[in-house]
Amino acid sequence: MRLKLATEHGLLTLLFLAHTSKSMTRRGDYVKTKDISFQCDISYEHLTKTVSILRKAGLLQTHAGREGGVELLPLSQTIRVGEVVALFEHPLVHPTTRYQLHALDQLCDAALISFFNTLNHTTIQQLADDLPPHFFFRTS
């Protein structure tokens, strides 16, 4: 199954924020979108779309201004990988054929359910915790 590039961007953004939130010591420390763009190798234009989708889904909050940026909301620590994939891939549909093959439709539906059940065994925070400390560390 091939996922959209936007899905990868959404997952990387959440992983980066979850990974870096451990090192943030003060409330009000926000991650700049330009930093996310650089460290995750996502174009700034694509990242702004990704951040907008994640904000509307209630997973992160944005703060405008010179000292602004992005922060994870507490709910994000428990969000499952499959939920993020579904957010960006919705609606997932199985391939259609020229023939009405009910058995094939059922098989594809079962495969999608299995796919999401597997992804939903892991949270974004669990993935972030398993990353090496300098996973997102890029220098110009």
What label would you give each PLM region?
Residues 3-42, 71:
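N-terminal helix-turn-helix DNA-binding core of bacterial DNA-binding proteins
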Residues 45:
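Key DNA-contact positions within bacterial/archaeal DNA-binding proteins
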Residues 57-66, 71-72:
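Beta-hairpin "wing" of winged helix-turn-helix
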Residues 97-140:
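C-terminal regulatory/oligomerization modules of transcriptional regulators
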